[in-house]
């Protein structure tokens, strides 16, 4: 080691790496599941096992602290080759809202993760509002986030004043943590994952990406082939 003899032995057995006989099974690198509810939803139909939504926060809602490393879904997913995952909250009432986190699925109580690494949203059909309204609301939220600077988020008191003076922030009843996340979106180039399918919606998202210089990821995109040249 480093040009020096580290160990002498009379034994002819050479110490090497551990050999595991997989008995002809296929071996692959660990897979990453990029869109899951692993660790935050156990049984979808049982509300007491769901930690994926909030009635208070919108943009700044984080599921990270609710992650359950003992989830029964973890060993099942690991047996199918998934060793890490990005868990996402259910979309809030806002077209942009909710923070997703990356987790290593090792079932250890000392959770190995990257907290609040992505912001999520949606653009498309909604039972209560039109696409045009959702798109306008999304753009208003982005404009508000882009207008923020470091002094604006210096304290919760300052943030409360910013919210009070903003029609869109007041209308959405944003909280301090919501505003801080919107600041992060632009200051830290936080990835923004928007779920959308229609070709026209995808084009609108591309326009928003260019206008606001977003680190945009379009999820779903069933009609992406129709606008492949623009993508």
PLM-predicted stretches and their roles:
Residues 1-28:
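Histidine-rich, glycine-flanked metal-binding segment
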Residues 25-88:
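Metal-associated gating/positioning segment near the N- to mid-region
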Residues 30-31, 112-114, 226-229:
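Short, charged, surface-exposed secondary-structure boundary motifs
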Residues 36-37, 90, 197, 221-224:
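Short, ordered loop/turn segments at secondary-structure junctions
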Residues 43-45, 97-100, 229-231:
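Histidine/acidic-residue-rich catalytic or RNA/ligand-binding cores of hydrolases
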Residues 61-65, 170, 216-218:
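Short, flexible loop segments at the rims of nucleotide/cofactor-binding pockets, characterized by
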Residues 78-216:
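Polyanionic/metal-chelating signatures
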Residues 203, 222-231:
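Catalytic core of soluble alpha/beta enzymes
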């Amino acid at each position: 080691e480093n040009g020096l003899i580290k160990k002498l032995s009379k034994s002819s057995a050479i110490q090497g790496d551990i050999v595991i006989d997989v008995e002809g099974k296929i071996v692959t690198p660990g897979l990453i599941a990029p869109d899951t509810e692993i660790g935050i939803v156990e049984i979808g139909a049982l509300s007491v096992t769901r930690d994926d939504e909030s009635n208070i926060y919108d943009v700044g809602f984080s599921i990270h602290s609710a992650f359950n490393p003992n989830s029964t879904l973890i060993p099942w997913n690991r047996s199918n080759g998934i060793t890490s995952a990005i868990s996402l909250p259910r979309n809030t009432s806002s077209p942009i809202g909710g923070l997703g986190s990356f987790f290593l699925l090792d079932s250890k109580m000392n959770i190995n993760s990257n907290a609040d690494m992505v912001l999520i949203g949606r653009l498309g059909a909604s039972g209560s509002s039109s696409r045009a309204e959702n798109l306008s609301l999304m753009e208003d939220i982005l404009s508000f986030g882009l207008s923020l600077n470091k002094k604006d988020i210096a304290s919760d008191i300052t943030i409360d004043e910013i919210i009070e003076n903003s029609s869109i922030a007041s209308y959405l009843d944003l909280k301090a943590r919501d505003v801080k996340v919107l600041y992060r979106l632009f200051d830290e180039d936080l990835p923004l994952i928007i779920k959308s399918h229609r070709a026209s919606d995808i084009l609108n998202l591309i326009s928003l990406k260019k206008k606001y210089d977003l680190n945009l990821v379009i999820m779903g995109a069933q009609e992406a082939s129709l606008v492949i040249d623009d993508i």
